[in-house]
């Protein structure tokens, strides 16, 4: 019973091998699916599972809604969008990869055409006709279950983009623009779609505006264009001071605060008492202002000079005559004051400015503004946007309106509006998508406030100002681009609707939409060839966020600040994982727990803390919401109730790290690994490594090649199982049940009754991927890890993929490592390895190469794939079948023919002798040439698969037919198994119904009235059970139903087989002019050898320098030779001490495994073994692994699996302490310092000092010497210089450059130098001669003129200099 209870606690694979964890913190929440960012984004884009009425305004639905309805120019007809539905994909993912197709589904959109009665005089016009139709709008690529797209047969990933969020941003130039170092402030309104609007100060403190980064204009031109007059502009931006003329004296309304800091230009008295408050020439201070307020002064008498030079806030008009005496923003002069007195104007409004916090910026800008009216301003903007075009009033108005105020041309988006409103202090987060007058005013006001010292500029690199644009959103944008193109074409055709009785299908051409989508997935900078070296590289690629790409940054322009780690990256973006090189900091990886919210900002989870007590409630916070919170780290000490124990807690607040009291804490981190990405979270003892080395370690794990036999790391972090299951490379059970059948290529599961719903089959068949080529030519192969009869749960791992071992990620091998020098062979990070590693195939990898042969239709005739090839010996054709295609299983080497192909030659005039020979020996030989597919140089391997694709309508050859037969046999096998299980299920239910029932008759010896027994049923054939007649009518009806189910089952299976058959035997849709394509897959086995690159997980990389025989390797006293020797000098300066700790813990893990193996060999009781395992797993009294839930068989299986070592998990930032490592070493009876005396294998002498020996997890990286090294004798030459090409891909030579020439000159090696620069390089005549001479056995050299010298002569002549060679 205990076992049944424990089923949900541990998965099938976990129970076979537990990982001992040292983590002190229990993870409060499970790690979310690692691919969720991709899957959710595209799910929201398609909304396939949502009803039409419930669809949100996102994705496809939003794109259609924004473009439709489309009205004709006359307004008499319009197209409306009703809804859409996606069809079923024609081929599944596997077939698309094989056939080179795109995995996509047809999109059909319901469009309604509404025609109005144009002759009617009513408004709105009555509807004359409505036509509805489903219109095909092209194919939409579908995302696979693992977050990738299959485009033209290759797997691609669309990387998320981190771009500037729409909204408004305020910044300054950091004093770089002007020589004085003055800060010039600017504001920029960034829309999601449309023109950018910039406001900026110049060194003279005038405010300018730019539209789309064009020529700048004074900002008041924009304000005038919006309909504001000078008076309105000044009243919006300035406070006013009013002055009255009373009895020949000027009185200003006194607001004492405004005088603070000014120097009094006259004595200030209290009017009633005459008391002097400030004397002339003194600065007015806060004390003076208090006195003024105390004496309740309402106004202040000022001398006339005080007004001179002040600026008017309003126009001054003589009300009796209507005459303008002065305009708003004019300066007050002596003449103006006289004129006002003469006209009886007793009141003046002036703008209030000071040098400190009320600058006269807008007033100064108005002074340089050349326009005087709205029309002039519009014309000025028109001239700036369209230089050279003659402006008209209508054109200028339309242009300005279209810039920011029309939804089709301008969209801030929901994010932009939210960011905009929050920044300029508008309460609501919602509003129109276009700009309003008030928006523009509020931005200018905020900018001026910042210039006046109120408020701060924004930090562009803050993650609250950068948002993630994922796949769905980018696809939607492309889709909208396509729809807008369609809209233009449709508008023109809509005018024909009334006359020609057209349907929606006739109006809409879906090509532009398909083209836009195809272009995005095929050639966008963010749609990338998936990194598929191993499961981790795939997961990381999908979780990547890039600042590059359309609408993003470029490498050249990105500065240091953008690339740097920012405080808001905490828990959102990994501070470690980023590429080395020009993209450093521009391409990042999401942290383990991070996700994006509805606005696209990255959020990280936090536990809520209430009154110093931590709760289990988890909230996701974005960088904007986090600023004002106090957030503690996850390793804070808590008591049993969750109260924080410390008096002062380190926390994050306002993007800074500080100490605070527990009562202030609002939130706490969820987990210590929350700040790092998936790759970094796989590095044990990450906390002991330098950041630069951790970066290399993260990146190099992604380059690890899957080995022949995957081996789990002895020292891991506990993330291995999560990465392996989420990556999609292993097979995970969709539903629980019992394993019915297992072989190397498929698993059949009989599903639990409670997990099958009506109409679903009770069988799950998993076809495994066998020896499939990845994008990087590594091998994808799945192996079952379950046995027939095993009971499994939903989510259990059924089969391991590449780089997985028992459902855990396994990128490399555990090797016995010694840190010591060894005869200089590990100088400069070189590595020396034991021959045993090569012999045991520890690092043998399989690489699969795809070679393609295409038969085309040429002008001279068709190419043919055949075994009948001219001038080729019998031995060369020994691997080909009668169709001319290589057999599967053939061992081939460089130069061997894989596919025989002949190409027609052009007709040549034949001599009589040739004609005679042709008449005797037949036609074929001479009019075709051999163009067979051969194995490229430097490659050898085994043919593991051949695919033949034939153009539709052409006769298939024998090989193509046999491949089809194999395919059909596989389909048939699956269907037979499924049918068998479902039939058994039906018959089981029938027997259950019939047993012990009273029969009224039936086949065989069944008498009416007798009871049905099991013996009777066993004797009668199953098919005849339905002929038994039962007294009970209800049972008879159930029997009838089951009989119908059986019939339906037969029909369903036949239909499914016929559908599959049709798909398999149909011809292929090949490119124009292509008749047949043959793809040959070669498996190349690569053993590890000197020159290959290896690395640990801590950035400790090196190249193998030598493979040493086992007997020469250093060995321990018990005779165990070490596998690998590393240089100890590689540790201290690199500061990656994690590798040493890993080595110690690895030794302990192996030692514990050895002890368990010893106990098993001594046949000790399960209780004794369980007691020892309890010591290992639950060493500190905390029950981490519940061994009580295992029965004896399961316990012994577990112990058996631990012989090779007890796997350990030391989570990042929460790992094993030094003391814990020592206690594990002692438990395994090993020295606590982890050092061992080693003996030199060659001499038998002990080394002077004990050496650090232990187990380290080493990876073989995808930088193999076989792929890099090549040799050339003769080959292709560059056209212009006639020098050999460079690089392996071009079969090129080595460059003998300038410095190499100097070296030979220094040695005086004249003949060698001459040979290098002539016959070995670009002396065309000389190299032909020497080749001939060598063939004849004559090794003399006759050098001529190098071709590059002739090129030099030509270049000099091109400069107009006459130069010739003079021959003596």
From Swiss-Prot:
GO cellular component, one term: DNA-directed RNA polymerase complex
Keywords, in A-Z order: Antibiotic resistance, DNA-directed RNA polymerase, Nucleotidyltransferase, Transcription, Transferase
Top-level taxon: Bacteria
Catalytic activity: RNA(n) + a ribonucleoside 5'-triphosphate = RNA(n+1) + diphosphate
GO terms (BP aspect): DNA-templated transcription; response to antibiotic
SUPFAM superfamilies found in the cross-reference section: beta and beta-prime subunits of DNA dependent RNA-polymerase
InterPro entries: DNA-dir_RNA_pol_bsu_ext_1_sf (IPR042107), DNA-dir_RNA_pol_bsu_external_1 (IPR019462), DNA-dir_RNA_pol_su2 (IPR015712), DNA-dir_RNAP_su2_dom (IPR007120), DNA-dir_RNAP_su2_hyb_sf (IPR037033), RNA_pol_bsu_bac (IPR010243), RNA_pol_bsu_CS (IPR007121), RNA_pol_bsu_protrusion (IPR007644)
Pfam families cross-referenced by the UniProt entry: RNA_pol_Rpb2_1, RNA_pol_Rpb2_2, RNA_pol_Rpb2_3, RNA_pol_Rpb2_45, RNA_pol_Rpb2_6, RNA_pol_Rpb2_7
GO terms, molecular function: DNA binding; DNA-directed RNA polymerase activity; ribonucleoside binding
Keyword Transferase: yes
Enzyme Commission numbers on file: 2.7.7.6
UniProt similarity note: Belongs to the RNA polymerase beta chain family.
NCBIfam families named among the record's database cross-references: PRK00405.1, rpoB
Function: DNA-dependent RNA polymerase catalyzes the transcription of DNA into RNA using the four ribonucleoside triphosphates as substrates.
Protein name: DNA-directed RNA polymerase subunit beta
Gene source species: Legionella pneumophila
């Amino acid at each position: 019973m205990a076992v049944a209870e424990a089923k949900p606690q541990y998965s099938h694979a976990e129970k076979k091998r537990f990982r001992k964890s040292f983590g002190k913190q229990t993870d409060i929440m499970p790690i979310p699916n690692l691919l969720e960012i991709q899957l959710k984004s595209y799910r929201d884009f398609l909304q396939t599972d949502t009803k039409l009425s419930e669809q949100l305004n996102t994705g496809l639905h939003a794109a259609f809604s924004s473009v439709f309805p489309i009205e004709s120019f006359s307004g008499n007809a319009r197209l409306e969008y009703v809804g859409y539905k996606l069809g079923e994909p024609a081929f599944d993912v596997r077939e698309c990869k094989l056939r080179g197709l795109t995995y996509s589904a047809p999109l059909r959109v319901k469009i309604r055409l509404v025609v109005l009665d144009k002759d009617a005089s009513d408004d709105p016009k009555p509807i004359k006709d409505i036509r509805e139709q489903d219109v095909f709008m092209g194919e939409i690529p579908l995302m696979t279950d693992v977050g990738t797209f299959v485009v033209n047969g290759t797997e691609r990933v669309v990387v998320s983009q981190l771009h500037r969020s729409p909204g408004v941003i305020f910044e300054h130039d950091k004093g770089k623009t002007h020589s004085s170092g003055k800060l010039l402030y600017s504001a920029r309104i960034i829309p999601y779609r449309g023109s950018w609007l910039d406001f900026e100060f110049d060194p003279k403190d005038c405010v300018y505006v730019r539209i789309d980064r064009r020529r700048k204009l004074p900002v008041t031109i924009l304000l005038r264009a919006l309909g504001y007059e000078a008076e309105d502009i000044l009243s919006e931006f300035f406070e006013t001071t009013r002055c009255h003329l009373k009895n020949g004296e000027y009185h200003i309304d006194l607001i004492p605060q405004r005088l603070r800091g000014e120097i009094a230009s006259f004595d200030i008295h209290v009017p009633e008492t005459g008391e002097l408050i400030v004397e002339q020439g003194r600065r007015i201070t806060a004390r003076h202002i208090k006195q003024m307020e105390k004496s309740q002064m309402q106004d202040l008498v000022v001398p006339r000079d005080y007004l001179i030079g002040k600026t008017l806030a309003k126009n001054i008009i003589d009300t009796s005559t209507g005459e303008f005496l002065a305009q708003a923003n004019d300066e007050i002069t002596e003449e103006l004051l006289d004129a006002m007195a003469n006209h009886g104007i007793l009141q003046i409004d002036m703008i209030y400015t000071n040098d400190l916090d009320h600058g006269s910026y807008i007033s100064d800008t108005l002074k340089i503004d050349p326009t005087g009216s709205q029309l002039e301003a519009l014309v000025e903007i028109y001239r700036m946007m369209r230089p050279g075009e003659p402006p008209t009033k209508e054109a200028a108005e339309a242009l300005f309106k279209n810039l920011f105020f029309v939804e089709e041309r301008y969209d801030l988006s929901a994010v932009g509006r939210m960011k905009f409103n929050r920044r300029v202090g508008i309460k609501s987060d919602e509003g129109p998508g276009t700009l309003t007058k008030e928006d523009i005013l509020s931005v200018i006001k905020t900018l001026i406030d910042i210039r006046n010292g109120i408020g701060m500029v924004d930090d562009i690199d803050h993650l609250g100002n950068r948002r993630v644009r994922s796949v769905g959103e980018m696809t939607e944008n492309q889709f909208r681009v396509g729809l807008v193109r369609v809209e233009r074409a449709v508008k023109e055709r809509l005018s024909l609707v009334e006359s020609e009785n057209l349907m929606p299908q006739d109006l809409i051409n879906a090509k532009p939409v398909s083209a836009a989508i195809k272009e995005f997935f095929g050639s966008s900078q963010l749609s990338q060839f998936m990194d598929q070296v191993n499961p981790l590289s795939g997961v990381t690629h999908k979780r990547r966020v890039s600042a590059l790409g359309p609408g993003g940054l470029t490498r050249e322009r990105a500065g240091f600040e953008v690339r740097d780690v920012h405080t808001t990256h905490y828990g959102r973006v990994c501070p470690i994982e980023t590429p080395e090189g020009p993209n450093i900091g521009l391409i990042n990886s999401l942290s383990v727990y991070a996700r994006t919210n509805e606005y696209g900002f990255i959020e990280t989870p936090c536990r809520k803390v209430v009154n110093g007590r931590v709760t289990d409630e988890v909230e996701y916070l974005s960088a904007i919401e986090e600023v004002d919170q106090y957030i503690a780290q996850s390793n804070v000490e808590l008591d049993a109730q969750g109260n924080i124990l410390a008096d002062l807690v380190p926390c994050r607040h306002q993007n800074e790290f500080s100490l605070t009291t527990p009562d202030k804490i609002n939130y706490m981190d969820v987990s210590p690994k929350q700040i790092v990405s998936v790759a970094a979270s796989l590095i044990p003892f990450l906390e002991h490594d330098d950041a630069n080395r951790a970066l290399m370690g993260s990146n190099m794990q992604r380059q690890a090649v899957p080995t022949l036999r995957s081996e789990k790391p002895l020292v891991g972090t506990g993330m291995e199982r999560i990465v392996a299951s989420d990556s999609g490379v292993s097979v995970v059970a969709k539903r629980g049940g019992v394993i019915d059948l297992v072989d190397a290529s498929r698993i059949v599961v009989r599903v639990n009754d409670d997990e099958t719903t009506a109409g679903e089959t009770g069988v799950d068949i998993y076809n495994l991927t066998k020896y499939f080529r990845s994008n990087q030519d590594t091998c994808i192969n799945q192996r079952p890890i379950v046995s027939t009869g095993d009971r499994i749960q939903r989510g259990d791992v059924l089969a391991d993929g590449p780089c997985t071992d028992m459902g855990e990620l396994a990128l490399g091998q555990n090797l016995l490592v010694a840190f010591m020098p060894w005869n200089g062979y590990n100088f400069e990070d070189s590595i020396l390895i034991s021959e045993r590693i090569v012999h045991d195939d520890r690092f043998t990898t399989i690489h699969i190469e795809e070679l393609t042969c295409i038969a085309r239709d040429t002008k001279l005739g068709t190419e043919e794939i055949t075994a009948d090839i001219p001038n080729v010996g019998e031995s060369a054709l020994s691997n080909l079948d009668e169709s001319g295609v290589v057999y599967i299983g053939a061992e081939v080497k460089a130069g061997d023919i894989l596919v025989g192909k002949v190409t027609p030659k052009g007709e040549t005039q034949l001599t009589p002798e040739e004609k005679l020979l042709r008449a005797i020996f037949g036609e074929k030989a001479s009019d075709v040439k051999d163009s067979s597919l051969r194995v490229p140089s430097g490659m050898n391997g085994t043919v593991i698969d051949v695919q033949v694709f034939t153009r539709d309508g052409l006769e298939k050859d024998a090989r193509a037919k046999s491949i089809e037969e194999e395919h059909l046999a596989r389909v048939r096998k699956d269907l037979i198994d499924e049918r068998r299980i479902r039939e058994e299920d039906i018959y089981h239910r029938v027997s259950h119904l019939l047993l012990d029932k009273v029969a009224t008759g039936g086949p065989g010896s069944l008498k009416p009235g007798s009871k049905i027994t099991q013996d009777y049923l066993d004797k009668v054939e199953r098919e005849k059970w339905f002929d038994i007649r039962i007294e009970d009518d209800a049972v008879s009806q159930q029997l009838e139903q089951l009989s119908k189910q059986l019939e339906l089952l037969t029909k369903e299976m036949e239909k499914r087989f016929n559908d599959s058959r049709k798909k398999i035997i149909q011809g292929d849709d090949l490119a124009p002019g292509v008749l047949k394509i043959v793809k040959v897959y070669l498996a190349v086995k690569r053993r590890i050898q000197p020159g290959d690159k290896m690395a640990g997980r801590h950035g400790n990389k090196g190249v193998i320098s030598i493979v040493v025989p086992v007997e020469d390797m250093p060995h321990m006293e018990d005779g165990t030779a070490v596998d690998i020797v590393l240089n100890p000098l590689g540790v201290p300066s690199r500061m990656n001490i994690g590798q040493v700790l890993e080595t110690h813990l690895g030794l302990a893990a192996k030692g514990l495994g050895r002890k368990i193996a010893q106990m098993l060999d001594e046949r000790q009781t399960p209780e004794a073994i369980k007691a020892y395992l309890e010591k290992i797993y639950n060493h500190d009294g905390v029950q981490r692994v519940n061994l009580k839930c295992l029965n004896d068989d399961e316990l012994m299986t577990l112990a058996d699996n631990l012989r090779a070592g007890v796997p350990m998990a030391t989570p990042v930032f929460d790992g094993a302490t030094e003391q814990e490592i020592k206690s594990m070493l002692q438990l395994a009876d090993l020295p606590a310092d982890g050092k061992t005396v080693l003996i030199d294998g060659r001499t038998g002498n002990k080394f002077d000092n004990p050496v650090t020996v232990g187990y380290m997890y080493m990876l073989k990286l995808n930088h193999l010497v076989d792929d890099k090294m090549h040799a050339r004798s003769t080959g292709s030459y560059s056209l212009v210089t006639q020098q050999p090409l460079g690089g392996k891909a071009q079969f090129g030579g080595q460059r003998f450059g300038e410095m190499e020439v100097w070296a030979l000159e220094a040695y005086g090696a004249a003949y060698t130098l001459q040979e290098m620069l002539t016959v070995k390089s670009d002396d065309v005549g000389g190299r032909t001669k020497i080749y001939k001479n060598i063939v004849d056995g004559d090794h003399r050299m006759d050098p001529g003129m190098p071709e590059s010298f002739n090129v030099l002569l030509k270049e000099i002549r091109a400069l107009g200099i006459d130069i010739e060679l003079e021959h003596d």
